[in-house]
From Swiss-Prot:
Keywords: Amino-acid transport, Cell membrane, Lipoprotein, Membrane, Palmitate, Signal, Transport. Induction: More strongly expressed in the presence of methionine than in the presence of sulfate. GO terms for biological process: amino acid transport. The gene is tcyK. Belongs to the bacterial solute-binding protein 3 family. A lipid is attached at residue 21 (S-diacylglycerol cysteine). It comes from Bacillus subtilis (strain 168). This is L-cystine-binding protein TcyK. Gene3D superfamilies: Periplasmic binding protein-like II (3.40.190.10). GO terms for cellular component: plasma membrane. It is found in: Cell membrane. A lipid is attached at residue 21 (N-palmitoyl cysteine).
Length: 270
């Protein structure tokens, strides 16, 4: 009887040890954090940055950078949630997403509500953009009496609004919600005279559309762009900064920029 009791005690101890080992398998290792799922809010209408390719896959510079961060941060699992650009910050504020990855520029209004990481991952040169056969608009100074179309709440919209207000509002600003294709169609139809874009977005547009565009004039903004978080995500932001700096230092960010944007926009050059 004593032998049976001793056997049962040993068996119970063994089961307890195995159960503890099983519970530990939910972490990435002894003393390490459990894997945390991070939902990344992004769009599908930004050429080269976040878009759906011919295979139906979400890809682009911002998307592939997040995938690279996913490889280097094993205690996080990054997943994507796509939506219209105008819904990104609303979703972030409602904690429906944890990060916004969509070439986001800092502004006082945004910094009041949200957190930006510290390490910039792109430099975003914005220029006035018109149809290739338009020789009358050579820069923003030529937009008097014109209609300029852009995405609401975008970096370009902020630049246009500020310039317009500082210069007596010489042109009308209109907003679209369907991305680059709608903008191009409005330019072609004459409903809009110009837009604001980047050289790499225009290059992609010209390769994939029959509506050809060009950038004109001086660079209006060469802002650095960052990821956006809620104010309580400082640890996540810091972890991303550490991995992002490694991606910059080993040349991976430059390679991503050359592949998706056609030049090295990982550093300021305009």
């Amino acid at each position: 009887m004593k032998t049976k009791t001793a056997f049962m005690a040993i068996l119970f101890s063994l089961i307890t040890v195995l159960s503890a080992c099983g519970a530990g398998s939910q972490t990435t290792g002894a003393g390490q954090k459990k894997v945390q799922t991070i939902t990344v809010g992004t769009g599908t209408q930004f050429p080269n940055i976040c878009f759906i390719d011919e295979k139906g896959d979400l890809t682009g510079y911002d998307v592939e950078l997040i995938k690279e961060l996913d490889k280097r941060l094993p205690h996080y699992k990054f997943t994507f949630k796509t939506m219209e650009f105008s819904n990104l910050l609303v979703s972030l504020g409602q904690h429906k997403v944890d990060i916004v990855a969509h070439q986001m520029e800092k502004s006082k209004e945004r910094e009041k509500k949200f957190l930006f990481n510290k390490v910039a991952y792109n430099h975003f040169p914005l220029k006035i953009t018109v149809l290739q056969n338009n020789d009358t608009i050579r820069g923003i100074e030529d937009l008097k009496g014109k209609r300029v179309i852009t995405s609401a709440t975008s970096n370009g919209a902020l630049v246009l609004k500020k310039w317009n207000e500082d210069n007596g509002r010489p042109f009308e600003i209109a907003y679209e919600g369907q991305g680059a294709n709608e903008t191009a169609n409005q330019l072609k139809s004459g409903r809009a005279d110009a837009t604001i874009s980047t050289p790499f977005a225009v290059d992609f547009q010209n390769k994939t559309s029959t509506i050809k565009e060009k950038t004109v004039g001086n660079v209006l903004s060469n802002a650095k762009v960052y990821f956006m978080f809620n104010k309580n995500e400082q640890t996540l932001s810091d972890d991303i900064d550490k991995a992002l700096q490694e991606i910059i230092d080993d040349g991976t960010l430059k390679r991503l920029s050359l592949k998706w944007l056609g030049d090295d926009y990982s550093k300021e050059q305009y």
